[in-house]
Amino acid sequence: MKSEWTIKKLSEIADFNPRESLRKGTVAKKVGMDKLQPSCRDIPFYELEAYTGGTKFRNGDTIMARITPCLENGKTAKVNILEEGEIGFGSTEYIVFRAKEGVDEDFLYYLVCSSIIREPAIKSMVGSSGRQRVQTDVVENLDIAVPSYEEQHLIGRILRNLDDKIKINSKINENLLHQLHVLYLRLFGDSVMDIPLGDVVATTSGGTPSRKHDEYYSDSSICWVKSKELLGNYIHETEEHINNLAIKQSSAKILPEHS
């Protein structure tokens, strides 16, 4: 039986950019923005560097990019590369979320990844074009429906298990691609000519319809492909859609099927 969910501010269930002590010059694990993979929970790489500044975090914290286009691309991760009590650091362009007492850290991570947080965060962005940043106070004051801790834990566990399965499947796919490459070399050798890409394919580019115009994204039927959706080999559906008005009033382009 589903319990009653309580409406709370996000700042009531998570600490934002919690204070941590890390002396300058201390060698620690650094997670640069380039180390995060779009729509990927785990942090695949880090560097050991002397701390000179940046956001600080511990295992279990969620780090979310607050700058465009990294946030739109899905750069949000759950820290799992540190030892007990160890502090890591990273880009100043992260927002760090730490689950408060009585809040499940996996539930918080998947909440931050959801449209419940992402969409208002993206809409709150301010700044010059190409360097827009999330207004942290807007995110802190979002109203969130929060279940009991038991339900949080159940939700977090289910989604964590699915993520674990995705990770296993990704490793299987990497192995299959490696086998395909080995088989290709065995069949055709390495005597492949290098020619300019433009000699065999036509390339084009476009631009993103302004996020300030909600009407571009309403009553929409045209698939809008974001960079995070280029991770697979095929695109069958997209998270967002745009309409003909967006095409007419921006540099976005419609590409033919099988592009």
Regions found by a protein language model. Name each.
Residues 6-144, 198-259:
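DNA target-recognition domains and sequence-specific DNA-contacting regions of bacterial/archaeal
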